[in-house]
């Protein structure tokens, strides 16, 4: 079962989860509201479609990736793991991190070497930060920009299949 929330804020014909002050720096009020909205969405989804938290994975691209990480940093027991594509770890956003709950929590991170929106260094820092927090991290870089490719999706699919094979 795949359920995808739409980000709440309008952005030039698309949507965003929160406003940005600078690259890697979410605007505090909208970021806090976005994390609360995602929390509410997950609560409603699990009520409507009873899902075992041990089989619930969050997947996101760009801001969706950042939101998936933010939620899991604060409430790791509510999800099985995270698939984060082309994002960063919002450690400086004022989140109260549940370090004990992150121990062994599986994450897969993918990032484009040529990403001009969120530099590759942000992906590498996310990998290092999650590893430091005790998460189980698989990290892949691909010859792409700020995008998703068949190659990156194949790696993600293989990882997810492995995670669900218990």
Where are these regions (language model features)?
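Short aromatic-enriched loop/helix-cap "lid" or pocket-rim segments at secondary-structure transitions
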Residues: 13-17, 95-97, 151-154
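Short beta-strand/loop motif that positions the catalytic acidic residue
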Residues: 108-111, 115
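Serine-hydrolase catalytic machinery in alpha/beta-hydrolase-like enzymes
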Residues: 1-55
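Alpha/beta-hydrolase-fold catalytic nucleophile elbow
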Residues: 6, 59, 83-86, 110, ...
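Alpha/beta-hydrolase active-site loop signature
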Residues: 7-11, 89, 146
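C-terminal catalytic histidine-bearing segment of alpha/beta-hydrolase fold enzymes
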Residues: 108, 121-166
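Primarily recognizes the serine-hydrolase "nucleophile elbow" in alpha/beta-hydrolase
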Residues: 54-102
